[in-house]
Regions:
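Histidine-centered metal-chelating micro-motifs
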Residues: 19, 51-64
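Active-site region of the double-stranded beta-helix
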Residues: 1-48, 68-72, 76-130
Length: 130
């Protein structure tokens, strides 16, 4: 499971199928969605007959599986003041009955180094003098 402490997710499926589980720890409630470009099912019942964006706020546990045919989606995520790249992509083991969770993978391990690496110290020094 993922849970973003500082990011709200706004997911729209453009092609294929996405299976999305969400879990609210405060309410201890789970919901399952099947999302296609033109329909949304909630807990296996038609929820909306048309294109839609599925939205969940920060702090909600979620997991997503692409359908057998694959899928294309966009997530227009928004960041809150609590956003930190260091913990945004952590992966958790979640007990949906008790709401207890534990970190099983530090998401920062999967993030790229965003610092530019100069090819040599001479270029770095010349650039810094500018």
């Amino acid at each position: 499971w993922y849970m973003h402490p500082g990011q709200d997710d706004n997911l729209m499926v453009l092609q294929g199928t996405r299976y999305v589980d969400i879990f609210c720890q405060k309410k201890k409630e789970k919901a399952s969605f099947i999302i296609t470009p033109d329909k949304v099912y909630k807990n296996e019942k038609l929820y909306y007959d048309g294109p839609a964006m599925i939205v969940w706020p920060n702090g909600i546990f979620h997991r997503i599986i692409s359908g057998e045919e694959g899928s294309i989606s966009i997530n227009l995520s928004t960041r809150t003041n609590d956003f930190k790249l260091k913990d945004n992509f952590n992966i958790y083991d979640l007990n949906i009955y008790s709401g207890e969770y534990r970190l099983i993978r530090d998401g920062s391990d999967d993030q790229p180094n965003l610092e530019y690496v100069f090819p040599n110290d001479e270029i770095k020094k010349l650039f810094k003098e500018m």
